[in-house]
Amino acid sequence: MLPAVSDATTPSAAATPARYQVVGIGNALVDVIAHAPDSFLAEHELVKGSMALIETGRAVHLYKALGSAVEMSGGSAANTMCGVASLGGRAAYIGKVSKDELGNVFGHDLHAVGVAFRPGAPSPETPTGRCIIVVTPDAQRTMNTYLGVSSLLCADDLDEAAIADGDVLYMEGYLFDRDDAKAAFRRAADVAHAAGRRVSLTLSDSFCVDRHRDDFRQLVRDSVDILFGNEDEMLALYEVESLDEAIEAVRRECPLVAVTAGADGSYVVTPDGTVRVAAEPVERVLDTTGAGDLYAAGFLFGLTTGESLADCARLGSIAAAEVISHVGPRPLVELRTLI
């Protein structure tokens, strides 16, 4: 039997109707995606499946070494907001870009797919960030990210009116690498809760969790109603060896958790129990970039339209299945046609 949703994941009765179903906050990046053999990772000392932060010089070196690549606006939370819009939902995004060519491309791309972009104040000295994604033959993605101005987001950059006008606030763990961003997350969560809204967080990456474990745990306990993470991220968050241990630990700290486990599907965890939902079948996996982002999009779209938790997870699986069937972190078809 599907566990009930905790009261903590239900909007306050006093909350006014939301203009947006989901409002995301994250690193506003342009993705540079290329296929390469495992030998490329070895040659450039890249850890398969990881997300490494790099400086300008390293970014230029890897970009030149890749050769042919696909470039598009990206960033984890931005991908999720685009997924929500593709499903027919109303989404807004808060992120920091510069007044440069890539920044203009980023904003135009979001508006083109129906996501309201609420940029922070630009910084003339720092360019728009970009993420270099190497996809190996096994469809694993290895990310090297030059954060640029995206990482400078602070509480002053928040559009608090948009946050208060969103049913669910969605915060991207990748942004957690600076104290100003952590403070912005806490402020955003406070604004959302004061308006009777729900707060969600995606852990983003196990290495990111390792860097900020204590801060993540505190944020989850104090401010998060809905938590997203994959198996590795959950194990890292609680420093345990098995998924069962991680599920029992997170159950005590967060009222609603969605844990993705690749081909094994996903687990929906509440204080009342755990339900496993099978993954959507995919004929051929070409690129896992954006799988977790689109799963969150489907899940939150379902949650904000009143679906059961099992159906929320199924919507997440449908969205993730579409995005891993091709190169790139955004859907190539309107997801609303698949549900």
Annotate the PLM regions:
Residues 17, 160-164, 220-221, 251:
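A short, aliphatic-rich alpha-helical micro-motif
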Residues 91, 117, 199-200, 257:
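Hydrophobic beta-strand scaffold residues
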Residues 118-122, 133-179:
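Conserved phosphate-binding/catalytic loop of the ribokinase/pfkB sugar-kinase fold
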Residues 168-248, 264-266:
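Conserved beta-alpha-beta core of the PfkB/ribokinase-like small-molecule kinase fold
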